[in-house]
A protein has these predicted regions:
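RecA-like P-loop NTPase motor core of helicase/translocase proteins
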Residues: 1-605
Length: 605
């Protein structure tokens, strides 16, 4: 395996065409050769090999592109050929020197010129972000004017959606994590809105947008897509020319999470009372919302708009499973894998059912899926890890690494934990999973000892912390105003609480009712000072569903310590909502989400 790639992975500018790439061998490992052309869309992820290699099948490689007979006439499992073909057309179209040759509206042409050539004062769009939007524009405005050459792409999309999403038309834009999906969303909204406002009779464009996220924390971060947000991308990142900002203000945008699509009870009736009434009337009492009532609750701003565009963030959670095959798949799974499959399907079912309701009641022209991993999940009834067949653009992690957009992921090739031929840190969960706490943070969760976590996990934390400590010191010496961020992702809330306590400190309860402090084992992450007092501005925060609801990860003195930042947050809320009372009462859960969303930002919570 070549070390050249790992020593010097960056070949291209993030703002220009990625005209070079590292060659990969048959096993997906980098060679010494740099090829003077763009990388084709292939689903290969190069990482350093362990000292002892396992077979490709054991490593869980994607089966895309194999000869296993996964594709049918109705459902393609390997859309990468169509992605490369679309890419070729878009590149030729982009190279046309005269905007009159672009076959787009004057407004679209102006936006394209702005994104490609404007001298941005701040953050400039990456090539991959512009390309994703160019792909959407080309498929919408250009391809229909090319006769049979363009019709084949519409036919592909219709066929890909017919089986998986019969009520919807979806286009997936695949962007590596860190490549900036939010900016792409802002550009899509700008393109649609400006055209819809200036061509009100056109059925091709819309100024109504439903943005769906998988959770409230992601939803909060997407608020920069609202035109009236203090940090709105349209103005602060110059997504549109100044004279188009007034058009953007006419956009109707709703940002929600998929949970909002669940039909709610309109009347609270006790179980016994319900049974008595239903027995007397001999019919079921309908107390659930109708679809129309749900939509009125979730998106009242969009109720008068007939052509809505949906933007799905982290869209791999949204699909219509094959019911028979999904049941068979779940039957083959056991334990946590079976629970995961059921949870995946429940999430997907609620998400896509909500979009189908929007289509039936209001009208929906297009769904744009944005995800780094637009793959079918376990239990979907499709082959796990197969790409959504309506994926039409791809900027992979390897592309992002070669353009310097994301750092090279580091995975262990060796460790100092004795036993075994392969590094345990490489697949840590395989070695500690059965010894980790199960789901839930009830009474049993409180009796678990953070200092009794598996040795392999504690050793991994110490190893990563050692690297963090060196980076922290370098940043301090260079005068960087914020510390680097250390993120630990856990499988459930019990595990996250134990790791949190191990890292930051906790009070141990004794049999006689007294407590004693066990300070955090990683000094820079401690939430207690040397005298055992809790630090008002914590070095470590715990973010999970329970914490977001309770908000109890923040010390009572935090509000006083962060008074200036909290006041700035109140003003932001008022500007964002145009409600003078929005900042009067900020609950701890909202405050905790804001803390998480502004980690690493100066003068923020």
């Amino acid at each position: 395996m070549s070390q050249s790639f790992f020593e010097r992975p960056i070949l291209n500018s993030p703002y220009g065409y990625p005209g070079q790439h590292w060659e990969l061998d048959a096993d997906g490992q980098p060679t010494d050769r740099i090829l003077p052309m763009r990388r084709r869309s292939d689903l290969i992820t190069p990482v350093p090999k362990p000292k002892k290699r396992r077979s490709k099948r054991e490593q869980g490689q994607f089966v895309l592109g194999s000869d296993d007979g996964l594709s049918t006439a109705e459902q393609e499992y390997n859309p990468t050929p169509i992605i490369n073909e679309v890419r070729t057309h878009v590149e030729a179209w982009r190279a046309l020197p005269n905007p009159d040759q672009w076959l787009v509206s004057p407004e679209t042409a102006r936006l394209l010129q702005h994104w490609r050539h404007h001298s941005f004062q701040g953050v400039k769009p990456f090539f991959c972000q512009i390309e994703a939007v160019e792909t959407a524009i080309w498929l919408s405005e250009v391809a229909p004017k090319l006769g049979p050459r363009g019709a084949k792409f519409r036919a592909h999309l219709e066929g890909a959606n017919a089986q998986a999403n019969p009520e919807l038309m979806r286009i997936a834009l695949k962007l590596a994590t860190g490549a900036g999906k939010t900016t792409v969303m802002a550009m899509l909204i700008a393109w649609q809105t400006v055209n819809a406002v200036r061509h009100p009779n056109s059925r091709q464009f819309s100024r109504g947008f439903l943005i769906v996220a998988p959770g409230i924390t992601i939803r909060d971060r997407l608020r920069v897509l609202m035109p009236n947000d203090p940090e709105s991308y349209y103005k602060h990142r110059e997504i549109v020319p100044a004279d188009m900002l007034a058009d953007i203000d006419r956009a109707k945008i709703v940002i929600t999470n998929y949970h909002a699509f669940k039909l709610r009870e309109r009347v609270d009736i006790a179980k016994g009372t319900r049974a008595a009434i239903e027995g007397w009337r001999e019919e079921k009492i309908q107390t659930l919302e109708t679809e129309g009532q749900m939509l009125q609750r979730v998106m009242p701003e969009l109720m008068g708009i007939k052509r809505i565009v949906v933007l799905n963030d982290e869209a791999h959670h949204c699909y219509r499973e094959r019911v028979r095959d999904a049941v068979e798949t779940e039957a083959e799974l056991k334990g946590e894998e079976k629970d995961e499959a059921k949870e995946n399907n429940q999430t997907a079912r609620m998400w896509i059912s909500g979009l189908e309701a929007v289509k039936r009641k209001l009208g929906l022209t297009m769904v744009y899926d944005l995800s780094a991993t637009p793959f079918f999940l376990r239990g979907s009834g499709y082959v796990e890890g197969t790409l959504f067949p309506w994926t039409m653009s791809d900027f992979s992690l390897m592309d992002a690494i070669e353009c310097g957009i994301v750092k090279l992921p580091r995975v262990p090739v060796a460790d100092n934990v004795p036993g075994g031929d392969t590094p345990k840190f490489r697949n840590l969960w395989d070695h500690i999973g059965k010894r980790m706490p199960k789901k839930g943070r009830g009474a049993s969760g409180r009796t678990l000892d953070p200092l009794s976590l598996p040795t392999e996990l504690l050793t991994a934390l110490e190893a990563l912390y050692g690297h963090y400590e060196k980076t922290f010191e370098m940043w301090r010496e260079e005068g960087i105003g914020v510390p680097p961020v250390f993120i630990v992702v856990c499988n459930n809330t019990s595990a996250s609480e134990l790791v949190y306590k191990y890292v930051s400190g906790f009070h141990r309860e004794h049999d006689d009712g007294t407590t004693s402090l066990e300070n955090g084992r990683l000094a820079l992450f401690r939430n207690y000072d040397d005298y055992g007092n809790r630090i008002a501005r914590p070095n470590t925060i715990l973010i999970d569903s329970a914490q977001l609801e309770s908000g109890d990860a923040l010390d009572k003195g935090f509000r006083e310590m962060a008074a200036d930042e909290l006041d700035r947050f109140r003003r932001d809320l008022i500007d964002r909502t145009r409600d003078q009372h929005a900042g009067d009462s900020i609950d701890d859960a909202t405050l905790l989400r804001e803390v998480m969303n502004t980690v690493g930002k100066k003068e923020r919570l």
